[in-house]
Amino acid sequence: METTLFKPALWQIPHIGSGGETALAEKTETLKQRLHRIVGSHRDARFASSLAAEDMVITDLIAGENLNIGIFTLDTGLLHTETLNLLDRLGRAYPHLRIKRFRPVREDADRYVESKGRFAFYDSVEARRECCRIRKTEPLNRAIAGADAWLTGQRREQSATRTELPFAEYDAGRGIGKYNPIFDWSEHDVWAYILANNVPYNDLYRQGFPSIGCDPCTRPVKAGEDIRAGRWWWEGRNSKECGLHK
């Protein structure tokens, strides 16, 4: 008797039907205006791109509008091959853009591995947060040093901790303005823009990853699950942030 292995259906890129072009155009125009407002209000604004789908929308508009917003990403040293490949593709798609990479201090990362173990982040929330601090938070602080504003691709729909996310806020810990220009876009809006404008995106989205972080800390999500269920899945449901957005 043959045994058939059941494979659960995974999250998929939303199907985008016809008829929403006007609404998308209006949202896109609003997003453009927000980005222009940020540029007009700050001498040095920088966009922290995680290379997620929503970040690709913002990147495409920064390029298309020729906006004076610096773009950087955090290369944690633990990214998926697909994510690194996307960085190479972005260089070809937007040859006039320079996306800076910020990496962890090598000595700090090595010390963490030597003292705790290569996969210590699985052992406790504290150990995982320490890894995130070394590989994400500290490089972010260097990336925005000297800026007077930074931008994120956060959206209200992404998680329970972001439902009240505003367009503009003040990052008191770093003493600068912080903007979430795409905060009110839905997942459908994001993918409608990407597919309509042929914007590059991470190949992992086609493999059931709606939210993408470091390779050891991200896995595919089943259809119908919370989109961040694949992030740090071994922790509690309320522990789905890395500490960048305190």
Swiss-Prot record:
Principal place of residence: cytoplasm
Location(s), subcellular: Cytoplasm
Enzyme Commission designation: 1.8.4.10
InterPro entries: APS_reductase, PAPS/APS_Rdtase, PAPS_reduct_dom, Rossmann-like_a/b/a_fold
Active-site residues, record numbering mapped to chain: 242
GO molecular function, one term: phosphoadenylyl-sulfate reductase (thioredoxin) activity
EC primary class: oxidoreductase
GO CC terms of this entry: cytoplasm
Single GO BP term: hydrogen sulfide biosynthetic process
Annotated binding of [4Fe-4S] cluster, by residue: 131-132, 214, 217
Keyword Repeat appears in the UniProt entry: no
Gene3D superfamilies on file: HUPs
Keyword line: Cytoplasm, Iron, Iron-sulfur, Metal-binding, Oxidoreductase
Domain of life: Bacteria
Catalysed conversion reaction: [thioredoxin]-disulfide + sulfite + AMP + 2 H(+) = adenosine 5'-phosphosulfate + [thioredoxin]-dithiol
UniProt remark on cofactor binding: Binds 1 [4Fe-4S] cluster per subunit.
Pathway the protein acts in: Sulfur metabolism; hydrogen sulfide biosynthesis; sulfite from sulfate
Family note: Belongs to the PAPS reductase family. CysH subfamily.
Entries under PANTHER family matching the protein: 5'-ADENYLYLSULFATE REDUCTASE 1, CHLOROPLASTIC, 5'-ADENYLYLSULFATE REDUCTASE 3, CHLOROPLASTIC
HAMAP family tied to this protein: CysH
Described function: Catalyzes the formation of sulfite from adenosine 5'-phosphosulfate (APS) using thioredoxin as an electron donor.
Protein name per the record: Adenosine 5'-phosphosulfate reductase
Species whose genome carries this gene: Neisseria meningitidis serogroup B (strain ATCC BAA-335 / MC58)
Upper taxonomic lineage: Bacteria, Pseudomonadati, Pseudomonadota, Betaproteobacteria, Neisseriales
Gene that this polypeptide is encoded by: cysH1
